[in-house]
């Protein structure tokens, strides 16, 4: 099949004219120089894609436009496709020609919709409210209804990958969804009014790093892993706060981690282990499977560790 016979790009429901209007007005503005300079991009062996720092606060109320919703820590480049109708003419299959600039703007508009929807879902999570597909279409997706599967999938992936929040369908008939923390963990770090971003995703990464190292991971290994995400010892992070306090105090007090001196080390070195609450709520297998799902490279890099974890759980060790 030639490239001309492949699927067409999805467009807003109102057609080409509405698409052009959307490209100019519906959030397709390029980021400012300050926003680009403020973005912290990195890639992690545990978390695929490009991460960017999340601004400290969100705008109040439901997102109406990308200008009213700060960028989520994910940069997504994708194209939304739909299959041509059978029997359509070659010209219909090809669709209207678009310039590279229009293509780029349309992709950016879709990416902005992903950001909007992810923010909307985060608000639903904090409010402990269910959300329906109809509500998402009406309040966020709007003219991009044909692209809903892609936008919804990318937004859900972002929540799971970065914040450790899973979007689960609870009623297929009404397309109703609930948002819960991943892997059975009961912690999200939203303890005060100023806490707006769940921290479960970072906890899963730390637990995953420990699982990949065996029973424990040195402090150096943990900070090296977090460093590629832009999370550094002693440096305040927009989403996670002060990471050293989070790891060595908060999560230790919550019994998700143990932080102890390496026996016999002189000068003293420290290591992290799973705490009793982590062991009670989840397992090495679940954490490693989560890591594998968010980054297929882990399956290649750590196959023996994954097999060992599976065997360990089967034996009840």
From Swiss-Prot:
Q: Which GO terms describe its biological process?
A: negative regulation of apoptotic process; negative regulation of transcription by RNA polymerase II; positive regulation of cell cycle
Which residue ranges have biased composition labelled Polar residues?
66-82
List the PROSITE patterns hit by this protein, alphabetically: MAGE
User: What name goes with this protein?
Assistant: Melanoma-associated antigen 4
Every MAGE domain range: 110-309
GO MF annotations for this entry?
histone deacetylase binding
Q: Which SMART domains would you find in this protein's record?
A: MAGE, MAGE_N
- Per UniProt, the ranges with Basic and acidic residues bias are 1-14
Cysteines engaged in disulfide bonds, as pairs = none
Instruction: State the gene name recorded for this protein.
Output: MAGEA4
* Entry GO CC: nucleus
Keywords annotated in UniProt: Tumor antigen
Tissues expressed in: Expressed in many tumors of several types, such as melanoma, head and neck squamous cell carcinoma, lung carcinoma and breast carcinoma, but not in normal tissues except for testes and placenta.
Residue ranges of the region described as Disordered: 1-102
């Amino acid at each position: 099949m030639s490239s001309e016979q492949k699927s067409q790009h999805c467009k807003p429901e109102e057609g080409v004219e509405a698409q052009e209007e959307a490209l100019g007005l519906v959030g397709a503005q390029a980021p400012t120089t300050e926003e680009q300079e403020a973005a912290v991009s990195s890639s992690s062996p545990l978390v695929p894609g490009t991460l960017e720092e999340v601004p400290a606060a969100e705008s109040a109320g439901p997102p109406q436009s990308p200008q009213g919703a700060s960028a989520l820590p994910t940069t997504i480049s994708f194209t939304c496709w739909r299959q041509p109708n059978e029997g359509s003419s070659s010209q219909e299959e090809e669709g209207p020609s678009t310039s590279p600039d229009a293509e780029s703007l349309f992709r950016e508009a879709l990416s902005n919709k992903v950001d909007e929807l992810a923010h909307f879902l985060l608000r639903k999570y904090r409010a402990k409210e269910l959300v329906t597909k109809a509500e998402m279409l009406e309040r966020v997706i709007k003219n991009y209804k044909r692209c809903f599967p892609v936008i919804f999938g990318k937004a859900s992936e972002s929540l799971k990958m970065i914040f450790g929040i899973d979007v689960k369908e609870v009623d297929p008939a009404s397309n109703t969804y609930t948002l819960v923390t991943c892997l059975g963990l009961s912690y999200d770090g939203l303890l005060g009014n100023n806490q707006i971003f769940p921290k479960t995703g970072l906890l899963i990464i730390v637990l995953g790093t420990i699982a990949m190292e065996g029973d424990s991971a040195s402090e150096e290994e943990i900070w090296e892993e977090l460093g590629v995400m832009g999370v550094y010892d002693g440096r305040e992070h927009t989403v996670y706060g002060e990471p050293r306090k989070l790891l060595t105090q908060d999560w230790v007090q919550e019994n998700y981690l143990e932080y102890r001196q390496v026996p016999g080390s002189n000068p003293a070195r420290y290591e992290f282990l799973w705490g009793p609450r982590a062991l009670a709520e989840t397992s090495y297998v679940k954490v490693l499977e989560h890591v594998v799902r968010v980054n297929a490279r882990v399956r290649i890099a750590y196959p023996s560790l994954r097999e060992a974890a599976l065997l360990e759980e089967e034996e009840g060790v």
